[in-house]
């Protein structure tokens, strides 16, 4: 596994993407003095005996209850065990790993009062690929992602289960086999570990990285569909988009121009085409996809900031031994970012489905009905378009903003919450749905371009069509469609479609690949 030096507070989206893809984070040693100073500040606060929330008091509605000095370790263990109350399927290992790395970076900024040895255990778990089993349901996004982060922390004290390279095991068994030892949590450490937005942020970042591949694949499929339908590249003329000035629209139009450059199919109808304008699903790709790109970039900016922040409570300022209670655990920024990603993903899939519908309709595409040479005897792409419609409809239902909901918790002490966890968790499924739609479009567009042979598309799009044809032959007669669709979906999901387009530069959402 690749090792990545993690600089707390200064990590890039490319860093987080690399960790999501499997890189192992190793803390920059420059953060050590701040970690040590923060832990020492907590020790001095404890010694003073004054009431400080989360250090020597109860939690939430029970904040007014003072805890004796002899019970402080028990207090931290109790909050972890009592708050590990999530339900549902475990979060995916890659996202759980990212969550742990986000928590590691937050604690290492020296504002949480966590001792070096506790932080070192979290880092060692990542290095050994010992990943807590974390039920994915149970967070309302304030006060932080309490339940899921408690499940993560429970493993650190020897409770719960882990995923390891060798399978799923009780935490204590996994620790022994990897030479790890559970930690006894000190004052404030349990609260610092389980309070924060890292669960929601990890899910949102994972979806962002997958949405980047989705967006680029949709551009490739859209360009191929434009050629399949003998659509015009005139709507991608830069002069149109420079007048409107939206960056995403300008870059999307440029990418579409570059993808189609040199297409013999396009040149075959440049002169004498009786169609004056294409349907919106072709003509307005820069406007729709460009808007999606801009929204995804805004979400990326928000999540990049959040990933570099400290979001537990209270926060420790070692320079004057101050513990300040605030609300950095409130995940409203993450909830808004997740809602933005949901809207963009929904529209990317929606536009793709409209192109599929256009291609299978002979009145719009000029090609055989449902892209089959013998319509009637064969149904061709009839039901794949129905499947695409079903997936798009499901995404539209899921795209309703999560951030507008709130249910008070903790006896109304926590009376407004973000619902960021739900908003972020739904995104991976939405991206999967949209990925399937793009895969179906890829098959339909390749089929359409086949009908124009011997005319060929551009070099970039021909490479994509040949990639498809290497796995899925032209559809002459009806056959079992599902395996073909799965192969095309896998091409989109893996980024193979984008790579096949070669040197054509496609806009990026989250920094360098």
Swiss-Prot record:
Keyword tags: Cytoplasm, Histidine metabolism, Lyase
Its EC number(s): 4.3.1.3
Posttranslational modification: Contains an active site 4-methylidene-imidazol-5-one (MIO), which is formed autocatalytically by cyclization and dehydration of residues Ala-Ser-Gly.
Subcellular localization(s) per the UniProt record: Cytoplasm
Cross-link (5-imidazolinone (Ala-Gly)): 142-144
BP GO annotations: L-histidine catabolic process to glutamate and formamide; L-histidine catabolic process to glutamate and formate
Gene3D superfamilies found in the cross-reference section: Fumarase/aspartase (Central domain), Fumarase/aspartase (N-terminal domain)
PANTHER family, sorted: HISTIDINE AMMONIA-LYASE
Listed name of the protein: Histidine ammonia-lyase
Species the sequence originates in: Mesorhizobium japonicum (strain LMG 29417 / CECT 9101 / MAFF 303099)
The gene coding this protein: hutH
